[in-house]
Structure formats: C-alpha cells, structure tokens
Amino acid sequence: LEMAGFDHAALVELEPAACATLRLNRPAWNVIEDDLRRFDGRPYQGIDLVAGGVPCPPFSKAGKQLGAKDERDLFPEAIRLVDECRPQAVMLENVRGLLDAVFDDYRNKVEKQLKKLGYVPGWRLLNASDYGVSQLRPRVVFVGIRKDLAAGFSWPEPLKTEPPTVGELLHDLMAANGWRGADRWREQASTIAPTLVGGSRSTAGQTSARLAQNAPGPPWARRIRSVLRSMSLLVPPAEPYSCW
C-alpha cells in the first residue's frame, strides 16, 4: 500500500512483536497496539481505504473451517469499521479456503452487508507469482468500492513475464559474505518459493522449522539452531560465510 502511494492514518495490530517491527521500520506511522474489537473507527471518517488481513484460521483448510462460529472471525469487525470510517474503498485478504462452497452463505452475507452500506463488492483468487513476486502465494482478495466510484475499478491482469527464481533474486545476498557455495545454491534454487506455513503464537511454523533444520552451517551453528527450534525462537539466519 505504501508503494501504491497510500499514507497510513492508523495501523491496528494485537501482536507486540509485529507492532515493534512496524515502529522500528516506520517510526512516523501511527501504530496502535490493541485488539481490533476495541478500535473506534469514527475519528477516521472519510479516509480513502480500509485494508487488512483478518485472521485466516476460521476459513483455512488446515483448520476446522468454523467460519462465523470461530471466535477469531473478524470480518464482522472489518464491516463495522467500514461503517464507522465510510472510506472510498475496502480491501481484505484471506486464504483460498474462503471461496469453498461451505462458505457461500458467509460470503453472500458479507456482500449483502457491504451493499447495504453503499459499496459494490467482489471476490477474486489472486496469486502473488502472477504479479512478479517470487513465491507461490494464492490469496482471496475482497474488494468493496463505493457505489459512485465502482465504475472506475478493474481487477489487475496477470503479468505476461515469469517472476525471478529464488536463486536469481537472492544470490547477491547469499554471496555477500564470500560463501563459496552461493553459485551452486543459485542453481539449485531454480524455482519460486513455496507458500510458507505459519505457526501458532507459541510454536514455530512447519516450513520455518524445516528450513532451519536443513540450513547449512558448522556443528555449533546447527546446535544453536536446534536449541532455538526447541524454544520456538526461530529467527532467519544471516548470510552464510565462506567457512560454510
């Protein structure tokens, strides 16, 4: 959104670590560390866009797909904020499971509520790799445009070019400290990245754990990462050194 030209009036996030990261990288932004359910959108009436990613577990195929019965479902809160802020547009993203037939009634209910507020709603499954991102990341994007502006909106067309491979994209970083295996790594990393599987607040994600386990390094480095894994304190490794 920043690259698209938007200025952020407020960012609401519950996780302290995520808020700390935002404040570190964007100190001028208004980061509000709080539960979205307690956030009052009325002071922000007239903003251009309400955007966010509501929790995915209620709709994920990896979970029970409880939808509205899941206490983590924040679509109602997003609609409340749209009602309070009355932006020109709303954009929300979620997992592809939201388009499953089991959620037809749920999506229809969301559309009905947005139409009642004066918006033209639409859903689409978009894949980041179709737009130049070197990762397989399909996401359902919901867009609601204020009725008087809806005629000017169209969904983006996929690019005709393939995104760079992970090796092409990250080779210079992997070679930054003189790692002799960087060229071979580039050849082996000849595809885009898979979807990274996240974890809960208390456990590391499955993909992150697998990548950490397979990371190159001397025995002492592998031992340290093993301890970090057991403590759910996984962190991305720095660029490999020439001794690796």
Predicted regions and their residues:
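Conserved SAM-binding loop of SAM-dependent methyltransferases across substrates and taxa
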Residues: 1-4
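Short beta-strand element of Class I
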Residues: 8-9
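Conserved acidic E/D residue at the C-terminus of a beta-strand in Rossmann-like folds
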Residues: 12-16, 93-94
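Short alpha-helical
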Residues: 16-17, 105
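Conserved SAM-binding loop
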Residues: 22
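Conserved SAM-binding strand-loop segment of SAM-dependent methyltransferases
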Residues: 28-35
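Class I S-adenosyl-L-methionine
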Residues: 39-49, 54-226, 231, 241
